């Protein structure tokens, strides 16, 4: 890994380095496949969309189904994980008296989606509040307490939304245990696995969550936007519409009849669930069709999925120790851990390092008073500007990017490993982060660009 996949010719753009954790990137072989598909679509749009695409979608769905260890007829493709989560929640028919449980570190767009659902359905939300770092089993206990407290209020807890890997802070979530607990409590498990497929080993056939979605463009090396949505056969009767509703819509038995679809495709013998997602409005779906090319790259250039998983985890954790050592701080992990391999939170290709910049976030930071810092606690209203300035400066002065964000009374930085990165890349960025922190401490930052 590291430089190996880049020789004799680089297969990723150099400017993509260190920037793929948020939106993903893809190698040149996949880009060539994308451009060829787009050229074919433009030269013969009707045959391509009506005939070529359904068959090619089947090949892509088979690839991701095999990677997730589930049947092809239980996976479809959507634009992104946010769309996947929204599609499931929209189809559950949530109403007043129902509740959805979610966690404090939920992805921001998903939380806004939940707020919107409350406005439209009058359902209730119950947030599991917590502060990292802590032991994963404590999270599970807090979740069970939240479910039972909601029931004590007379609410029907329909579903729980949680991640495979939290976006910020970048830590692995105890999603396997939460699926077990949801099953025991009679709550539908909806996994937002945005940072899942291609990043960590996933066996949904064994895990058996109720719903799962994951971006292929973040870690599987497909173009944007491309995500998998998994719905096991036992729940497919619940899913009757896409977002937006399109030609595959499955009306309720008492609904008015609709005319025959003008988008009948060449792919026969499919379930209503599969057909539902085969054509969703008119968009460029060629990223979906690049999954076979991405999987070929992973096998032939990177040495296969297991090698990728191992490389990402080891590099991310080595990188975190390098950066924390330079800053004189620590990596986010469970209390009392002596080596990163003992940590569940660090068992992935993203890690989170504390910056020596305390903040006034309304919490009591006195227990952390002995930790290294370069300045007095930042007022809460200054934190967004400082984070933006640090991120802007990383781009403008160093042509790289790392998310900087507040959590639990401190600023933190998220590190993402990738197959095109290696140890020296993080040895390079560590003193840069240290310099930025010292500049914040000296109050030398200019007005952040909005």
In which residue ranges do the predicted regions lie?
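Pyridoxal 5′-phosphate
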Residues: 1-450
